[in-house]
Amino acid sequence: GARCAYTVDGGRRGEVETESFSADAMTVMFHGFNTHPGYAKGRMINAIKVAADFIQLLPRDRLTPETTGGDEGFVHPYTMQAGVERTSVRLIVRDFTRPGLQVKEALITRLAEDAVGRHPGSRATFEVEEQYRNMKEVLDRYPEVAEYAREAVRRSGLDVLEQPIRGGTDGSRLSFMGLPTPNIFAGEHNFHSRLEWVSAADMEKAVEVIVNLCRIWEERTPAGSRPIGRVV
């Protein structure tokens, strides 16, 4: 089987990416009590209003996708299903370290409990789902996998560009499944927006890098022990 792999899913020409976010999804379920609104005095507990208070308590000028960059993580509420009896808020949590994820998830829990405290009789339950982890944790143990990619970029006449991915790739999961998988550029821009586009010239250059990468593995690996590489 393969000893390593490379995804071709990056942006600017020359990029070699070995570090990604660590990512969790978190669901906060707010529980209220529904009854006939005409006779609800002193009885109804509206879970929608509890959730609204929770969202109001979330940070606005920090820890959000629109206020963070570089090595900063964030908390992002992205969808909700609302009803008087139950309202769920789905969030994604991103950081480059596992402790950073835990700090942000503890913040979400505390703010949700603060919102519940404003509405006697309501309660909140929490569910955390692991999505992927920072592939750097694995790739640091196999430095030649990324170094060969850097050399392939240089052989193609490009400068190597490296910075953490503020997102994830298939390599984020593959690396933790035992297949160290850095990411190589493909000329993609404006990811996940209505204005997403890809450069044909950069795609051609990415192919050249892949060919050089295959040659480097051939050169550096003793005959009889050559790994089977994959390009995803």
Tell me the role of every PLM-derived stretch.
Residues 1-47:
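Fold-level recognition of mixed alpha/beta catalytic cores in primary-metabolism enzymes, strongest
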Residues 47-232:
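Metal-dependent amide/peptide-bond hydrolase catalytic core
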